[in-house]
């Protein structure tokens, strides 16, 4: 049984059984028909994934692994906020007529900042510190720039990553202010597990723990029947992540640099409505 499945099932059961509904409150998200998209939530979920044991991917529903990696590279490698650089349509609802999602996600990672050692963007600063100052407790990124929030078409959900080197092991804490459990949980866990593998590989480190901290873990009202169906399934064993050993530079990775070997998963036959 995949450990990612165990975590997801446990989280969803906890939310459905003991969560709090926001139906009495005004909410921002809307369904395609204009109706308010309400949620049931739990506050402060913390999940730990040891990447030395297995790669965390759900099998109780088939995950679009390649698309998830493509979006990860769009943000962290291309540092783009234009959907023209993305090979999927997951951001179309938040893009303007030019294809931009504003000063969000990749834009923030690409802004150069002045440090004592010189000018770096946030990704290059992480790479620098992992190589030259791995004992630092200051290796982190943040996408939640209050100065630019008014120019973001969607505020960052997964907004901060703190990296920590323990011996020769690279660990990371992913902070997420908001998590749509059905559409995004398995997706984000896969992505940041891949990201941890990438940083570890180019820094001569071993990928260790990914700790996922979710402030508001929620299930939308119209997602409840789909979630109940998915978590009733019998999980398959976790697949193995293959990563191209020839990719020795962070910026040389492509979607073809990764694949899941031995991945068996249940098909997702129901269309998932997305609240915007």
Task: Annotate each predicted stretch with a short phrase.
Residues 1-276:
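Terminal, non-catalytic protein-protein interaction segments that mediate quaternary/complex assembly
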């Amino acid at each position: 049984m995949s450990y990612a499945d165990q975590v997801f099932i446990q989280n969803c059961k906890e939310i459905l059984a003991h969560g709090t509904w926001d139906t009495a409150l005004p909410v921002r998200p809307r369904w395609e028909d204009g109706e308010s998209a309400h949620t049931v939530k739990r506050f402060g979920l913390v999940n730990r994934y040891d990447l030395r044991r297995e790669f965390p991917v759900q099998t109780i529903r088939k995950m679009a692994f390649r698309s998830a990696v493509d979006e990860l590279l769009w943000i962290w490698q291309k540092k783009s906020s234009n959907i023209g650089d993305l090979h999927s349509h997951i951001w179309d609802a938040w893009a303007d007529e030019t294809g931009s999602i504003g000063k969000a996600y990749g834009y923030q990672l690409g802004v150069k900042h002045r440090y004592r050692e010189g000018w770096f963007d946030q990704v290059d600063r992480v790479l620098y510190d992992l190589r030259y100052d791995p004992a630092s407790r200051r290796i982190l990124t943040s996408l939640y720039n209050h100065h630019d929030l008014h120019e973001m078409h969607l505020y960052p959900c997964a907004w901060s990553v703190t990296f920590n080197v323990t011996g020769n092991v690279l660990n990371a804490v992913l902070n997420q202010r908001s998590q749509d459990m059905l559409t995004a949980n398995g997706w984000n866990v896969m992505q940041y597990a891949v990201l941890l593998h990438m940083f570890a590989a180019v820094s001569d480190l071993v990928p260790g723990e990914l700790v996922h901290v979710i402030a508001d873990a929620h299930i939308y009202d119209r997602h409840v029947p789909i979630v109940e169906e998915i978590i009733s399934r019998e999980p398959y064993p976790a697949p193995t992540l293959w990563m191209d050993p020839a990719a020795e530079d962070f910026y040389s990775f492509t979607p073809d640099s990764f694949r899941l070997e031995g991945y068996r998963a249940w098909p997702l036959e129901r269309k998932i409505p997305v609240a915007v």
